[in-house]
Structure formats: C-alpha cells, structure tokens
C-alpha cells in the first residue's frame, strides 16, 4: 500500500497570514491580521483533508452538514445531538433566520415558490455533467438582514472531469468561495465539510472524487488566536486520514451521522480558542 503524502496547504496559509497579514479591524471588535485572496487545492483521492496539527471535532462537522442538508435553521436539532457550535448566534427560540440550510434547500422566488438548489445540483450532475452552471449560493442579498450571521462560505460550484478510460466514472470536483475566513477556528471545519459534501454528492451521482478547491476572500487570524497559532505552527502535520461512507442512501438528504467513518486520523492535541461573535 502506497503511503499517503503529507500535505500542508492549510498550515502554509496560516503561516502566510500570520507573518505577512495586514493589521485590520473587524465587525466583532477583536482585531485581526488579514490577507485578501488565497486558494488551496486538495486532491480528495489522496485522503480526507482533516487538519492534523490540532484535533478537529469531526462530529460537529458531520452534524452541521446534515443540518444544512435538512434545510434547517434552528439550533435545536444540533443541540439534541450535542452540537453547540451555532449557539452563540441563536435567538431565544433557537432560530437563526434564513441561513445556509434555508438558502440551499428553499431559496424563495418572487412568485412565492422555493428552489431546492441541492436537488438541482444532483439532477444536473446526472443529466448534464458538463454544465458550467452547477452552483449553490447562500448569499441571498434580499434576506441577509434577517440572518443571525451572514454566510461566510457563500458560494460553491461543482465540476465533472470526464474519465479518459472507457467505462470509468468521471471525477467530481468542488470549488468554494468563502468571503470571510477565520483561519484558526473556522477554516478547518469548512475544508472538511465541503470535502465531505463532495464525497456524498459523488456517491449519489456515481462519480469518483476529484479536487476540493478552497478560495478565500478576507483570510484572517483574530488577535486573540495569536498564541494558539504559534503553537500550531510549531507542529509538523501528519498524512490525512481516509473517509469511508458505509452505505448509499436513497438520496443526498437521507444520510445519517453513523454512515461516516474517518480512518487513520493521526493528530496533535486540540487547541482551545475563543469564538469572535
């Protein structure tokens, strides 16, 4: 068995922003070092891109993605499963307004209807895989003011590279545009979440996985994360683990937490840090 390569795109981004970022204010009043515009590419056939220089809480990543795919925008479902990552932004009744899941699954139309963007993606990949319009947007300008937190990971596109071998399935890649990227806390979640989504969509559409491309806008490290970043950058990364999906449900919306297993996740200890709200 060929050993998996050790990749460090994420750590390179962190180091670049930490060493060369511009001091910049922000909405939370915390202060940041920031760089505008960066891209990372992860070959999903090499392994599942779960950051190894600190332990990342995989359960929260999986549950949050399933919550998005439910079209849900109330934290109760997450809380019932022990996931509290959205609690800081929730209103008293648990609602967050029309955030990610609502836009993904039921984008409102002027005539009172709704568009299920995720179902459109699946349908188009199966019928027109060469389409350049296989896109999901969470950035609904008309509804931003009603959201507890405007979308940070705002827009993503799928792409199928046809196989050069007759009879083999094509390779599915996904590119995400993240307008606001909290490098220490948020970005490891976002990378793993969209890599997982790419695996799920590929399974549903009988495709192989290709690349996950992460494109960031305002890439920043909060000033109250500087010590944690120094700790993390002193560590050497390990090879990424692998992802196993244990069953193929009837649709993209029918996966359960128990369907996923990450194998061989070697990692350094977790590093705690405050969330900027």
UniProtKB/Swiss-Prot annotation:
Protein origin, superkingdom: Bacteria
Binding site for dUMP: 27, 132-133, 179-182, 190, 220-222
Swiss-Prot/TrEMBL keywords: Cytoplasm, Methyltransferase, Nucleotide biosynthesis, Transferase
Pfam family, one: Thymidylat_synt
Major localization class: cytoplasm
UniProt keyword Cytoplasm present: yes
Listed GO CC annotations: cytosol
Positions that bind (6R)-5,10-methylene-5,6,7,8-tetrahydrofolate: 57, 182, 276
Its EC number(s): 2.1.1.45
Pathway: Pyrimidine metabolism; dTTP biosynthesis
Function according to Swiss-Prot or TrEMBL: Catalyzes the reductive methylation of 2'-deoxyuridine-5'-monophosphate (dUMP) to 2'-deoxythymidine-5'-monophosphate (dTMP) while utilizing 5,10-methylenetetrahydrofolate (mTHF) as the methyl donor and reductant in the reaction, yielding dihydrofolate (DHF) as a by-product. This enzymatic reaction provides an intracellular de novo source of dTMP, an essential precursor for DNA biosynthesis.
PANTHER family: THYMIDYLATE SYNTHASE 1 (PTHR11548:SF1)
Name used for this protein in its record: Thymidylate synthase
Gene name of the record: thyA
């Amino acid at each position: 068995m060929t050993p998996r390569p050790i990749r460090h795109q994420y750590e390179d981004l962190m180091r670049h922003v930490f060493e060369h970022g511009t001091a910049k204010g922000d909405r939370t009043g915390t202060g940041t070092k920031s760089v505008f515009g960066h891209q990372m590419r992860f070959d999903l056939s090499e392994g599942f891109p779960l950051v190894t220089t600190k332990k990342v809480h995989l359960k929260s990543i999986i549950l949050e993605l399933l919550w998005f795919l439910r079209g849900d925008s109330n934290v109760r479902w997450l809380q019932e499963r022990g996931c509290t990552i959205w609690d800081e932004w929730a209103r008293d009744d648990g609602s967050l307004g029309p955030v990610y899941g609502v836009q993904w699954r039921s984008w409102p139309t002027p005539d009172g209807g709704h568009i299920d963007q995720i179902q459109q993606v699946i349908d188009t990949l199966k019928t027109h895989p060469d389409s350049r319009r296989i896109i999901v947007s969470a950035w609904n300008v008309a509804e931003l003011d009603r959201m507890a937190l405007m979308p940070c990971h705002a827009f993503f596109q799928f792409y199928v590279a046809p196989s050069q071998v007759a009879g083999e399935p094509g390779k599915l890649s996904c590119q995400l545009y993240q307008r606001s990227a909290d490098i220490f806390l948020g970005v490891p979640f976002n990378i793993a979440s969209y890599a997982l989504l790419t695996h799920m969509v590929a399974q549903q559409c009988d495709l192989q996985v290709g690349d996950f491309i992460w494109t960031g806008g305002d890439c920043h490290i909060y000033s109250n994360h500087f010590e944690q970043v120094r700790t993390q950058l002193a560590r050497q990364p390990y090879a990424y683990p692998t992802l196993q999906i244990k069953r193929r449900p009837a649709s993209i919306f029918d996966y359960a937490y128990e369907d996923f297993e990450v194998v061989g996740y070697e990692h350094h200890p977790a590093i705690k840090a405050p969330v900027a709200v």
